[in-house]
Design a protein with these regions (language model features):
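Short glycine-rich substrate-engagement loop in P-loop NTPases that contacts/grips substrate
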Residues: 53-85
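Conserved catalytic cores of phosphodiester-cleaving nucleases, focusing on short active-site segments
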Residues: 346, 366-385, 404
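Interdomain motor-coupling "hinge/lid" segment immediately C-terminal to the ATP-binding subdomain
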Residues: 128-247
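Pre-Walker A adenine-sensing motif
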Residues: 2-16
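Hydrophobic positions on the alpha1 helix immediately C-terminal to the Walker A/P-loop
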Residues: 34, 38
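Accessory nucleic acid-recognition modules appended to NTPase machines
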Residues: 200-365, 369-370
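Structural recognition of the conserved hydrophobic beta-strand(s) that form the central parallel beta-sheet
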Residues: 90, 115-121, 142
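Conserved lysine of the Walker
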Residues: 31
């Protein structure tokens, strides 16, 4: 299964300023597979350590963090010689042994020749729990579920993914039905690697749903296992409210939908926990269109999206038959699925700040507004081919952005500074 992140790993390997690498991401987005596959493809040997199931290695890191001593201990455990130039050293579930995280500082300072990649499903939480963390001594890589282009490649449609990257929109339009059909499948299957692999091999939607149910059950178990006891009920209520939050026309998060009378201060910690786990994307409001957008962030107003569109459909009980009814998929629960999909694709784009906009009166709302570092692009999301976008026009008149995007099921079209970008090509937004 091809992952675009593999190219980033290869650049890391070849960098002269390489530091130990930490891969962040939710459980079951493919971190372990990616690290092992990277070692298989680009190294002579790979030594894999899972700190969640290896007490001996936990003991090794419990005392002296001298790098020569640690390497010797790993060699004795694995029975293999670690060659700095040709061996990839993988630390998995590294959050389980905080001193293993701390050791990365010493590897960077005293033994930078070693190639070390780390990951942990709950790493974000560990970083907020007082763990001694090697600030400035490590590189980071965020891994998300498969994007739509990665889904196309996994489903045997590599040339279609390549065509999107080339942005040959006249040719893309000629094959738009293939893209639309694949997009409907992606809305159901999502991008969790196990679900995508199953679909690619068997085309069985029922099997995909069972996999998604197991993933959701595993997340629920994580709530009980890893979250502080006092916030577990709040995490569950908040998590289960997300489909109904997104089903509303105004998708701003409302605490009252979690529990009647709920207030922000009661659930802030639960939101932070889910965000640190990588299970939700918190998209904050901005009230202006200047660079950098973060300067205009309103931390009190936000939308919450799930990590994956397929999991959202599973939680909402979206049925397989919806896929067979023409464009009905984009009518039933259309706003939620479409905005979730767009958010998910935008989050996979490196160094892209993602927000949403409303003016202070609430009379103008832009579904997403993104900061590329060079320009701010407002993004209006339409589930079907309806191209009316009153708010987008109002925003353009006020802030005169270089380009504005309306993404829908309609074909690519550019008129002055307004671009209609097909939903299946939204990953290309930073390349416009």
């Amino acid at each position: 299964m091809y992952r675009i992140a593999m190219e980033k790993l290869l650049k890391w390997k070849e960098s002269k300023r390489r530091k130990p690498l930490i891969i962040e991401g939710a459980r079951q987005v493919g971190k372990t597979w990616l690290m092992k596959e990277f070692g298989r493809l680009y190294y002579t040997d790979t030594v894999y350590i899972n700190f969640d199931s290896n007490s001996r290695m936990a003991e090794l890191f419990a005392s002296d963090l001298d790098t020569e001593r640690l390497i010797m201990g790993v060699e004795l455990y694995s029975g293999r010689k670690i060659d700095p130039d040709h061996t990839l050293l993988i630390f998995d579930e590294v959050q389980e042994v905080p001193r293993a995280l701390s050791s990365l500082k010493y590897f960077y300072e005293n033994a930078p020749e070693y190639h070390i990649v780390c990951a942990g499903s709950l790493l974000g939480i560990a970083l907020h729990e007082g763990t001694s963390f090697p600030v400035g001594k490590v590189d980071f890589l965020k891994l998300f579920p498969l994007s739509f282009k990665e889904f196309l490649m996994a489903a045997g449609k590599e040339r279609y993914a390549e065509l999107l990257s080339k942005q040959d929109y006249p040719m893309i339009t000629s094959f738009k039905q293939t893209y639309i059909d694949a997009l409907k499948q992606y809305y159901f299957v999502g991008g969790m690697p196990e679900a995508v692999q199953s679909f690619a091999e068997n085309k069985d939607f029922n099997e995909v749903r069972e996999i998604q149910k197991r993933i959701l059950a595993a997340y629920e178990q994580d709530f009980s296992k890893h979250a502080p006891n006092e916030i577990v009920p709040k995490i569950r209520m908040l998590w289960n409210s997300i489909p109904s939050q997104l089903a509303r026309e105004n998708k701003k998060f409302v605490y009252g939908l979690v529990r009647e009378g709920a207030r922000a201060k009661d659930y802030e910690t639960a939101i932070l926990w889910l965000s640190d786990c990588g299970l939700v994307h918190k998209i904050s409001r901005v009230n202006a269109g200047g660079i950098p957008l973060k300067a205009y962030e309103d931390l009190k107003a936000f939308k919450l999206f799930l990590v994956d569109v397929g999991l959202l459909g599973c939680m909402a009980g979206l049925r397989q038959r919806t896929l067979l009814d023409g464009n009905d998929l984009f009518v039933e629960f259309k706003g939620a699925l479409t905005e979730q999909y767009v958010c998910q694709q935008l989050k996979t784009i490196e160094d892209l700040g993602v927000y949403y906009y409303t003016n202070d009166r609430g009379s103008c709302e832009i579904d997403f507004i993104v900061d590329t570092g060079e320009q701010v692009i407002p993004v209006e999301v339409k589930a079907e081919t309806n191209l009316r976008a009153k708010s987008l026009k109002t925003y353009q008149e006020k802030f005169t952005p270089e380009i504005a995007v309306r993404t829908s099921m309609a074909d690519f079209k550019k008129e002055d500074r307004l671009v209609n970008l097909p939903l299946y090509a939204v990953e290309q937004i930073a390349e416009l």
